[in-house]
Amino acid sequence: MARLALDADVVIAFLDAADDQHERAVSALRPRLTAGEEIVLSASVYAEVMVRPIARRTDAKIDEFLDAINATVIAIDRPTARLAAELRGRHRSLRLPDALSLATAIAADADLLTLDTRLDRIQEHEKETP
């Protein structure tokens, strides 16, 4: 079974019909869910996704969604953190949250689903580079 790591922007836009990227997130994620791909996300993505809902006291909606799609939150261990640092070293424009998201996907042998075209290009570059 294929593994799919979610970036924060996908989860946020998927769940917010008013988000400018909602339709894009739905069209990108729904077929992958239908295909039964195993869904993972880094602990840092989970934290990022929860900030606004916790403030608004709507955080249960996020947990219900993640439970419904059987998403696994993956802790960031030392090797993954080091990989994130290496990614930042190779790609100077990469922000730490994005580096952690991509590093978690790589460590989990998963494709990272993101709406960030820059991050997607970096992911493709990393796949092509041995």
Placement of each model-derived feature along the sequence:
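Asp-based phosphoryl-transfer active-site loop
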Residues: 4-13
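Glycine-rich, Arg-bearing micro-motifs that act as flexible, cationic patches
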Residues: 97
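Catalytic metal-binding/acid-base residues of hydrolase active sites
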Residues: 11, 118-119
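PIN-domain endoribonuclease scaffold, especially VapC-family toxins
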Residues: 2-3, 17, 23-91, 103-113, ...
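Short hydrophobic/aromatic-enriched beta-strand-loop microsegments
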Residues: 127-130
